Amino acid sequence: MRLYELSFAQIEDFFYKLAEVKDIIKDHGLLEFLPEFKKLDSTVHTGTTRVKHAFPIFQKGGVVMDITNVQQAQIAEEAGAVAVMVLDKLPYDVRKSGGVARMADPKIIEEVMSSITIPVMAKVRIGHYYEAKLLEALGVDMIDESEVLTPADEEHHINKWEFSVPFVNGARNLGEALRRTSEGASMIRTKGEAGTGNVSEAVKHMKIINSEIRSLISMSEEDRVKKAREYQVPYQIVELTAKIKRLPIVNFAAGGIATPADAALMMWLGADGLFVGSGIFKSQDPDERAKAVVLAAACWEYPEIVLEAQKMISEQKSMMGIDIKSLKPEELLQVRGL
């Protein structure tokens, strides 16, 4: 059987089990009887493509929460979030305040990093190479080159291959997802429409990506070559996507997720995990809502458990949502960064 005939989950499970076997052998003091295992370099090499792509895999099935301070970070960790994303303002407030949205204050990021044990991510403006270099120097676990912040470069994204820290990027369709992947992103998330509390755009983007992957699978090689040109990506990445029948990297859902039901819906549509922004901390019940969303994401296959999660919150305490149709074209964040 060829490697590309295995599913993503099968490959992931194999490497997890291989690591477990090595740990068991080491714990029982048997390495001296297995010289080949002793030769394996146990040093962690940061910055390699393998390491950068592996980190997001460990976030699969979990929820990353947007936060602006230490208190919110601690609530997220207590609720079971797999990571936090530090911003200067939550997306809802970015939308309301207008002006230029930039990277969060490094001092706040450091305070968050020292107060919790889960990974800490932070956002940079699209194309802002030096904001990314600062976050890399700061030691964050992942960088989000985000359309929520005001783009620094309207035409180009950061060349992420130059960094030792992994990046996540947003996408509305397969072309955007593969372009970001070819630039060195280690994770993709649907863009949705951040700061609205309206999950409809995240649903649309996830369905578009899934549909375009299905179309890719059924194409001839000649048509895939044409599609690679259309997407402006190397043919090999298109071919790999078709063969493994999914994006080559982890794909999370984001944009407008506000309730446990929203979380379960996006997981049901095929998301590997979730980013939840304003939906938690712009609600009136952030502690319970954070726990409920994490529970729903983890147990989305069991409606009875998601129902219990939904009962943990009050709809009357949910953030005030924004109808996408009421937004002017220039108010849409998702169109930033193609």
UniProtKB/Swiss-Prot annotation:
Q: Which UniProt keywords apply?
A: Lyase, Pyridoxal phosphate, Schiff base
Q: Which reaction does it catalyse?
A: aldehydo-D-ribose 5-phosphate + D-glyceraldehyde 3-phosphate + L-glutamine = pyridoxal 5'-phosphate + L-glutamate + phosphate + 3 H2O + H(+)
User: Which residues are listed for D-ribose 5-phosphate binding in this entry?
Assistant: D66, G195, G256, G277, S278
Binding of D-glyceraldehyde 3-phosphate, residues = K207
Similarity field: Belongs to the PdxS/SNZ family.
EC number(s) recorded for this UniProt protein: 4.3.3.6
Please provide, alphabetically and separated by semicolons, the GO molecular function terms listed in this UniProt record: amine-lyase activity; pyridoxal 5'-phosphate synthase (glutamine hydrolysing) activity
What this protein is reported to do is described as: Catalyzes the formation of pyridoxal 5'-phosphate from ribose 5-phosphate (RBP), glyceraldehyde 3-phosphate (G3P) and ammonia. The ammonia is provided by the PdxT subunit. Can also use ribulose 5-phosphate and dihydroxyacetone phosphate as substrates, resulting from enzyme-catalyzed isomerization of RBP and G3P, respectively.
Matching CDD domains, A to Z?
pdxS (cd04727)
What name is this protein filed under?
A: Pyridoxal 5'-phosphate synthase subunit PdxS
Q: Name one GO biological process term.
A: pyridoxal phosphate biosynthetic process
Recorded source organism is Saccharolobus solfataricus (strain ATCC 35092 / DSM 1617 / JCM 11322 / P2) (Sulfolobus solfataricus)
Source domain of life is Archaea
Gene designation: pdxS
| Listed InterPro entries | Aldolase_TIM, PdxS/SNZ, PdxS/SNZ_N, RibuloseP-bd_barrel
The annotated active site, in chain numbering, is K123
Q: How does it assemble?
A: In the presence of PdxT, forms a dodecamer of heterodimers.
Concerning NCBIfam families, the annotation shows: PRK04180.1 (NF003215)
Pathway listed for it is: Cofactor biosynthesis; pyridoxal 5'-phosphate biosynthesis
